[in-house]
């Protein structure tokens, strides 16, 4: 998993509340268990017209936001069914951080496991971030995980909370497999002892 330390990027404003996981990645893209390639399906029903061409009015299709690594979204982002494909699709598209006032619980937990940082802010802070994001290429946000800060284009700072363990995992690029591999010497030692103590196993 890629480490998350500091991200400096324009932020795409998605002023929609209750964005559910089916909107993030529709069901037809759930046949795969690969984490790569899902970026093309991200918000596909909003990004594309019926003929398959791009919808120029959707925020992620606008030139200023095509390479955005930060998404500023309305309340209750990631609600709905529990599909890990949602953070996979966001990450594959290039999104590293989603900022909202609230998140669906399962999406919130899955995000950390896949290198995606979900940040909760107040409604007042979200309104300010939407204002910054709508300036497009003329304004970038900086997400500093170590300092737990969102720095705006005009020097303003918003502090955010994060569980210390989740922060450690993101800073060090540790997913569940990475955490297990940290314990490999202890696991190997245990298995060696068990082979001697219980050779029939």
UniProtKB/Swiss-Prot annotation:
Gene name for this UniProt entry: leuD
Key word Lyase present: yes
InterPro entries for this protein: 3-IsopropMal_deHydase_ssu, Aconitase/3IPM_dehydase_swvl, AconitaseA/IPMdHydase_ssu_swvl, IPMI_Swivel, LeuD
Record function comment: Catalyzes the isomerization between 2-isopropylmalate and 3-isopropylmalate, via the formation of 2-isopropylmaleate.
GO biological process terms held by the UniProt record: L-leucine biosynthetic process
Record keywords: Amino-acid biosynthesis, Branched-chain amino acid biosynthesis, Leucine biosynthesis, Lyase
Family that this chain belongs to: Belongs to the LeuD family. LeuD type 1 subfamily.
Subunit structure: Heterodimer of LeuC and LeuD.
Catalysis performed (reactions): (2R,3S)-3-isopropylmalate = (2S)-2-isopropylmalate
Entries under Pfam families matching the protein: Aconitase_C
Name of this protein: 3-isopropylmalate dehydratase small subunit
PANTHER family: 3-ISOPROPYLMALATE DEHYDRATASE SMALL SUBUNIT, 3-ISOPROPYLMALATE DEHYDRATASE SMALL SUBUNIT 2-RELATED-RELATED
Amino-acid biosynthesis recorded as keyword: yes
GO cellular component, as recorded: 3-isopropylmalate dehydratase complex
Pathway(s) of this molecule: Amino-acid biosynthesis; L-leucine biosynthesis; L-leucine from 3-methyl-2-oxobutanoate: step 2/4
EC number assigned by the record: 4.2.1.33
Source organism, top-level taxon: Bacteria
GO molecular function, one term: 3-isopropylmalate dehydratase activity
The organism's taxonomic lineage, starting at the top: Bacteria, Pseudomonadati, Pseudomonadota, Alphaproteobacteria, Hyphomicrobiales
């Amino acid at each position: 998993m890629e480490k998350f330390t500091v991200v400096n990027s324009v932020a795409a404003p998605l002023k929609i509340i209750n964005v559910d996981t089916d909107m993030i990645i529709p069901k037809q893209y759930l046949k795969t268990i690969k984490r790569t390639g899902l970026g093309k399906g991200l918000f596909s029903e909003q990004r594309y017209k019926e003929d398959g061409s791009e919808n120029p009015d959707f925020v992620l299709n606008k030139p200023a936001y095509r390479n955005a690594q930060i998404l500023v979204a309305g309340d209750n982002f990631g609600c709905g069914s529990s599909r890990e494909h949602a953070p996979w699709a966001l990450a594959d598209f290039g999104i590293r951080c989603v900022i909202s006032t609230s998140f669906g619980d399962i999406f919130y937990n899955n995000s950390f496991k896949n290198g995606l940082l979900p940040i909760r802010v107040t409604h007042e802070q979200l309104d300010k971030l939407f204002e910054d994001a709508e300036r497009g290429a003329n304004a970038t946000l900086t997400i500093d995980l170590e300092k737990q800060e969102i720095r705006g284009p005009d020097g303003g700072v918003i502090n955010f909370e994060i569980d210390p363990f989740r922060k450690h995992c993101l800073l060090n690029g540790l997913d569940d497999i990475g955490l297990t591999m940290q314990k490999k010497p202890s696991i190997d030692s245990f298995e060696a002892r068990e082979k001697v103590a219980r050779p029939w196993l």
